[in-house]
């Protein structure tokens, strides 16, 4: 959908874009300056496959400071974005036929990554009535002797579902009785609206420490999506396997981007909270507007910058059968770009990203309301 919106915009068509999953804020000044200095210093060469010593130490510092996790530089690796980090991890730990438990609604890439790694995605749909939060009972029922990996993402894309510390610990206690790997996709960890900074799963349930693979990136927290730096922290055998894989695929990430990422992770963090405050204002406004439109409903998300809109109530009057078809109709008739929910695991929904200005959000809500009200 993002490409469709961009194509129309390039043709001069005014489209309100709610599809892109990236912050609309600029990368922080001191991070950009670090990149400029790297250029002036001639950092143009290959680096070690897993990243520069400076970046790896910054990752370790961040994990200790923010998550209470102690890793050595040998146990972390820098990749070409958070998606690359997740793909590497699945390639490293999955064998043909291994089951991968994926809570749904889910980020669209998880099942495909699992399948490309030989795994069998096992989708466990969380209930909308429970805020799209997976319960310990639902997780326990999904685990089988063939379960090799569980993926946990909080806050979540596409729903914004955000687990409390108690809920994370409860899921961890279930996983403590199984011998599977756990990937925590922490890319939205600081974009949450309850003011909490819960401890990490591997801290709350220490016996899981040797089975947890931490996946993260600088993309969302520091508005650095285009810089393409992700990272993984994991037991040494996993990092060694990923290093071998990465050495024969992408090799090292951009040297200049690595220096910028190190500055982001190790430098001042004071610009994060103002960004979250703006996201919270947008969330509150967009949820109020959507819930006032007949046939639409949305559970207020606890984090990230998405709302997952239940649109089943407008299928009859719009003449569509699912969220994907409604998304195409909204693009064609209202010139609003949203993402249909089918690929996220729910045909009754569509996703809106509110990582855009309030002016655009207001225009987009007006256009959706006007279109649905005219039918």
In which residue ranges do the predicted regions lie?
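Conserved N-terminal alpha-helix of the aminotransferase class I/II PLP-enzyme fold
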Residues: 46-79
């Amino acid at each position: 959908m993002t490409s469709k919106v961009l194509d129309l915009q390039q043709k001069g068509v005014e489209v309100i874009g709610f599809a892109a999953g990236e912050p609309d804020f600029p990368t922080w000044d001191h991070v950009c300056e670090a990149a400029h200095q790297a250029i002036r210093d001639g950092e143009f060469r290959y680096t070690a496959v897993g990243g520069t010593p400076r970046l790896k130490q910054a990752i370790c510092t961040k994990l200790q400071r923010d998550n209470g996790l102690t890793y050595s530089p040998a146990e972390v690796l820098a990749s070409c974005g958070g998606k690359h980090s997740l793909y590497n991890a699945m390639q490293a730990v999955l064998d043909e036929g291994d089951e991968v438990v994926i809570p749904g609604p889910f980020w669209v890439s998880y099942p495909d990554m699992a399948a490309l790694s030989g795994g069998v995605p096992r989708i466990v749909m969380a209930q909308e009535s429970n805020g799209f939060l997976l319960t310990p009972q639902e997780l326990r029922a999904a685990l089988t002797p063939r379960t090799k990996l569980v993926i946990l993402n909080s806050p979540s894309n596409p729903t914004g579902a955000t687990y409390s510390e108690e809920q994370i610990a409860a899921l961890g206690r279930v996983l403590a009785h199984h011998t599977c790997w756990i990937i925590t996709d922490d890319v939205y960890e600081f974009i949450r609206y309850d003011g909490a900074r819960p401890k990490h799963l591997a801290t709350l349930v220490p016996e899981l420490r040797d089975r947890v693979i931490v996946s993260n990136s600088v993309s969302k927290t520091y508005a650095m999506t285009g810089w393409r730096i992700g990272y993984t922290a994991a037991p040494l055998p996993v990092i060694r396997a990923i290093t071998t894989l990465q050495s024969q695929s992408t090799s090292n990430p951009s040297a200049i981007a690595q220096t910028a990422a190190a500055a982001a992770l190790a430098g001042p963090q004071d610009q994060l909270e103002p960004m979250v405050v703006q996201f919270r204002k947008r969330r509150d406004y967009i949820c109020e507007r959507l819930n006032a439109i007949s046939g639409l409903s949305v559970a207020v998300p606890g984090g990230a910058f998405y709302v997952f809109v239940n649109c089943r109530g407008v299928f009859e009057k719009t003449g569509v059968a699912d969220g994907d078809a409604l998304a195409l109709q909204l693009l064609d008739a209202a010139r609003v770009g949203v993402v249909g929910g089918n690929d996220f695991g729910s045909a009754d929904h569509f996703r809106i990203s509110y990582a855009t200005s309030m002016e655009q959000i207001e225009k987009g809500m007006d256009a959706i309301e006007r279109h649905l009200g005219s039918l």
